[in-house]
Amino acid sequence: MNHEKTNDGNNRPSYKESLNLLKTSFSMRANAIVREPELQQFWKEKGIDFELGLANKGSTFTLHDGPPYANGNLHMGHALNKILKDIINKYQILKGSKVRFVPGWDCHGLPIELQVLKTLDRKEREDLTPIKLRKKAAAYAHKQIALQKDGFRRWGIWADWDNPYLTLQKEYEAAQIKLFGEMAFKGYIYRGLKPVHWSPSSRTALAEAELEYPEGHTSPSIYVAFSVVKLPNLLQESLSKQGLALPVHEDGLSNKLKVAIWTTTPWTLPANMAVAVNENIDYIIAKDNSEKLLIIASDLREIVSEEIGSPLEKVAIVKGKMLDGVLYKHPLFDSLNPFVLGGNYITTESGTGIVHTAPGHGVDDFNTGMKYKLPIICPVDEKGFFTSEAGDFEGLNVLKDANTKIINALKESGCLLKEKPYIHKYPYDWRTKKPTIFRATEQWFASVEGFRNDALNSIEKVEWLPQSGKKRIKSMVEDRGDWCISRQRNWGVPIPVFYSKEGSKVLLNEATIKHIYNLFVKYGADAWWELPISELLPSNYSSEAHKWEKGKDTMDVWFDSGSSWTSVISKSDELNYPADLYLEGSDQHRGWFQSSLLTSVAVNSHAPYLKVLTHGFALDENGRKMSKSLGNIIDPWKIINGGNNKKLEPAYGADVLRLWVSSVDYSVDVPIGNNILSQLSDVYRKVRNTARYLLGNLHDFDPAKDGLDIGDLPILDRWMLNRTADVVDEISIAFERYEFSKFFQLLQSFCVVDLSNFYLDIAKDRLYVSAPNDFRRRSCQYVLSLIVERLAGVISPVLSHTAEDIWQNIPYKLNEESVFQRYWPKVPDSWRDSSFNKPINQIRELRTSVNRALEDCRTRQELGSSLEASVRISPINESLQNSLTFLQENGHNSVDNLFDWLIVSKVQIGGEPWAEVLFTKEDDIGVIEIAKSRGAKCERCWHYELDIGQYERHPLLCGRCVDIIERID
């Protein structure tokens, strides 16, 4: 071998070519913008993505995809959700499970209608028919789905992208109609007048899941006094016994005795039909400073007194049940209304303890009204304006000018006690961002009461992760009312009913449902708008077509998505019903988890899932919700592709985005931002560089011919394989438990602490300096080959592209083209030997202490490389002494040397203290002395040895390197 001369003028030979330097095509930089799409194309061409899961022979695993809405760009919430699902699916595929992940999209509803309307000019809007709107909405949804699908694929998500489920598909809509019919025939679907959350801005009823409750809404808060006109005899007797004699005549009583109520919705007073009290609460009759008497809850006397600005003196006290049957005069109209007994919703936490009851404008009010057969009055139209039933207030908007006019009328009549602004949370339409009201309308409902107990029992049988999810959904199902499933929109699945043109008869039976189901299988829901009634009706009804008109309501979109179990997973032999797992954001306890539960329980008496896993929301680095107004939106597209300024917004690639998902405790809200991405990029770089180092040292190694028996390996290598086995086990457990942040921590620790900082640091001399075929090098290479294959395997569910890139850069022949074809890493029993752990952990602690001492010398510029040092160790710790003895007696003489492990030129155990030392340290381990190494520096291995200059052909080398050079030559 020719040893070239250096260029420094000293005429010294260079031994660089005699070293085993790194060689690999696995680049230091990921170049993810180019490389990741190449790897995705490789998966596609080789049928390695979701097709791998379909080909597996193991048991079926079904993670049922909750459908994102087909509108708008993908955001960090999408990334968190879909990547979590992909990690789980890929792990299951690697375990050999049969996996077919069917992605879905929620396609109906108002937001898409609004997007379509935005694109139309005035003339187009005027000419817009329901079917024209539906065609445009479907086209818009398909376009959005295509864009979102491309984004999901770029993230490395494996799914049956060519066969997704869409809630607008014919077969999906047909299955939904069938489900509706099954619920109807079990008696769970009914039509009735009932207060529902109504959005005047979108003119439709809303489900609870379609509401949001922003802070800072201001309502007019008023205290009002209604005049009492009649008392039951028993109440009069009770008051008389307490010394309170009241006028018997109506006029005299009404001038003297009032009942005080408090409300933040003055506009509901025209619909007042009663006041409700709690039969178990103590109520007082209190005298104000004008000698008027007020009925209020005893516990609220001081608060009411302060609010109305008048001292209130207790005159008499009665239980709430005594007030049942009292009559009062309506404050705005000439009518008499009763006191009634309400439920536990009446408390003494606020107000007066007496509730103004308008059955047409509240659920509790409605239920109480039904109990007492009160009129259900709702004098408000779909746009939020008073109708003629509101008398002089007709035409006023209940959310704008009605409150002011009503308050003025109360002032004029002398009924107003107090008015002031009240800031509180108030239900808003989540789409239009405008306030809603309670409004009684004719709607279609699913009677949750009919199967509530079954639903609660089903909740108990599901595994909820985190466990708090169980309590959350259980309380929601316990407390919820019947589910209003009708909407007054055109873009949706119709409620398949017919109404008689004369009278109030509704046509809904098995024959009509079966016929409409068959039509929808063939034509989709558009048939409801495109076909005449004669064709929508079964043949035996077609002659009566002129007597019927079809319904105009569509189904709540939560009924759409909540039907996915019947439309998707229960219809495929490749999927499980109930699904093994549902995984969505924590807001879905009131959304998809619940709607799916209710429909499945109603029809099949069990939940559609065995396990439910929830995640939090993606926030900015300061814990704030992302919004355009705050300018804090983190765009996943920019994370992958970079911004305009690549220095400020680098192109990190999909794997860094995926690494972020694995790094967070997703059970709570999770932060993301530039600083976090920068830190994650550093972690990713360390993992990548570790893999590159492993690959770079395998360029001339083939385990088929260079492999060794595990039992013949040095102690250091045996320990490293045992540690690798432990890490594979721990990562496996983390994936089984969906604890991906533990995977992240384990991966980081393994690559940085176990490999880079310890094993590979020690291995540099073995790998670079040894002769290519030396045992000390081949044994290390064998271990590196075993590790790199396992490393690629365990990171593949998360760092999918990087794992594949590693696999394709392994220089020796593998049986599998893809890391995913190897399946989940297996660890032979021969790797496992925990007897090495204690002594090596002790020596690692010693190494840490020595490194600190060496660093102290470097800081004082007394040392450069650690190989310039010699170390004397005088252990006082018996455990350490035993570990050093174990190494000396059992270690391989070419590898397991303490000076190699400490990366110094000489180590002395015990003996007399050295005369000349750079540093002395004494701690629990014992005494550590650092001295300058004697001898000269070998120009090849950089060790300091006493024999430098003794070899004529290589005067600058130590004896070990001379031997290696001569063997290479």
From Swiss-Prot:
A Gene Ontology BP annotation from the UniProt entry: isoleucyl-tRNA aminoacylation
Function recorded in the entry: Catalyzes the attachment of isoleucine to tRNA(Ile). As IleRS can inadvertently accommodate and process structurally similar amino acids such as valine, to avoid such errors it has two additional distinct tRNA(Ile)-dependent editing activities. One activity is designated as 'pretransfer' editing and involves the hydrolysis of activated Val-AMP. The other activity is designated 'posttransfer' editing and involves deacylation of mischarged Val-tRNA(Ile).
Enzyme class, UniProt record, top EC level: ligase
Record: residues binding Zn(2+): C938, C941, C958, C961
Gene that encodes the chain: ileS
Protein name listed in UniProt: Isoleucine--tRNA ligase
Catalytic activities: tRNA(Ile) + L-isoleucine + ATP = L-isoleucyl-tRNA(Ile) + AMP + diphosphate
Organism expressing this protein natively: Prochlorococcus marinus (strain SARG / CCMP1375 / SS120)
HAMAP family: Ile_tRNA_synth_type1
